[in-house]
Amino acid sequence: MCPLWLLTLLLALSQALPFEQKGFWDFTLDDGLLMMNDEEASGSDTTSGVPDLDSVTPTFSAMCPFGCHCHLRVVQCSDLGLKTVPKEISPDTTLLDLQNNDISELRKDDFKGLQHLYALVLVNNKISKIHEKAFSPLRKLQKLYISKNHLVEIPPNLPSSLVELRIHDNRIRKVPKGVFSGLRNMNCIEMGGNPLENSGFEPGAFDGLKLNYLRISEAKLTGIPKDLPETLNELHLDHNKIQAIELEDLLRYSKLYRLGLGHNQIRMIENGSLSFLPTLRELHLDNNKLSRVPAGLPDLKLLQVVYLHSNNITKVGINDFCPMGFGVKRAYYNGISLFNNPVPYWEVQPATFRCVTDRLAIQFGNYKK
């Protein structure tokens, strides 16, 4: 049975889900974490990435920092009021949880000998200073969660093995060119909740990255950044101050299948802007200041979900969502939200939603002046 402390850890870390929408239980069982010998499972010489927890015999290392809990290769030292990274951490540790402490600095040798570490959780500390070689021993680190700290810059010399970086809710104002140099494996960055403006991104700041997912929400952006990785599948820029989408703003991002622009101040989307997104499946434009349905939606053959609620839309035309003729759209809508708009829904023609899978997928009404 899973110990209570481990269950609490898993539940706590599953609050901020990455783009794959995986809970922390999946994350903990990822390749390289709670590994078991396949000999115990199938008799072969290879290892399994997802062990059968009922058949795993708990192993406790003789090295466990005072006050921490150590189980398998997980070291949990959260909520202890720690001022520094503890010593005596077993070198075979794959997950080190140090969240909710008072750590203010990461020193050169804090992670010395932890060459097998796969995930490092430093969320909700007071970290403002990181030695340039602090992460050097972490040659297998893939997940670094360092959100809710006092950082004013992206940490230098991040491990080249890094796949996922969560650095939201810090004090970062600038992303300089070269800060992500050498991070060829990185595919997910969460950096919302920082006071970033458009001018804070130096040209070439994301050069070399092949990201699938990027979130820069709750920042100070006034427009869509034009120099983000063109490999992006998901881009979330919600809760900013974006006022318009101009023709070439999305030109670079033709591989997007999910775009989040909710809770901005968007009044205008230039005609043709959305035509650069042929693979788009989900579009969030809720809580803006749009007065009409954006042009170009019928041409997005794979679009399935559109959030347009809480805008100023007063009219919905018969061809605003669906292309004329049958067989043109490759995927039908399964979600269109239009509630909290001043549109008289009783005047909308039924044929407007001829390419929607079910009438329950359409949300109208609840407008308040």
Curated annotation (Swiss-Prot):
Q: Which residues form the propeptide?
A: 17-37
Q: Which GO terms describe its cellular component?
A: cell surface; collagen-containing extracellular matrix; extracellular matrix; extracellular region; sarcolemma; transport vesicle
Q: Which residues form the signal peptide?
A: 1-16
Which cysteines pair up through disulfides? They are 64-70, 68-77, 322-355
Which GO molecular function entries does the Swiss-Prot or TrEMBL record give? Answer: cytokine binding; extracellular matrix binding; glycosaminoglycan binding
Tissue-specificity statement: Found in several connective tissues, especially in articular cartilages.
What is one Gene Ontology biological process annotated in the Swiss-Prot or TrEMBL record?
A: articular cartilage development
Fetch the InterPro entries from UniProt: Leu-rich_rpt, Leu-rich_rpt_typical-subtyp, LRR_dom_sf, LRRNT, SLRP, SLRP_I_decor/aspor/byglycan
Q: Which Gene3D superfamilies match?
A: Ribonuclease Inhibitor
Residues annotated as glycosylated are 42, 48, 271, 312
- Magnesium recorded as keyword: no
Q: Which UniProt keywords apply?
A: Disulfide bond, Extracellular matrix, Glycoprotein, Leucine-rich repeat, Proteoglycan, Repeat, Secreted, Signal
Its localization reads: Secreted, Extracellular space, Extracellular matrix
Concerning PTM, the database record says: The two attached glycosaminoglycan chains can be either chondroitin sulfate or dermatan sulfate.
LRR repeats span which residues? 83-103, 104-127, 128-151, 152-172, 173-196, 197-221, 222-242, 243-266, 267-290, 291-313, 314-343, 344-369
Name the family.
Answer: Belongs to the small leucine-rich proteoglycan (SLRP) family. SLRP class I subfamily.
The protein's job, in short, is: May be involved in collagen fiber assembly.
Name of the featured protein: Biglycan
**Which species expresses this protein natively?**
Mus musculus (Mouse)
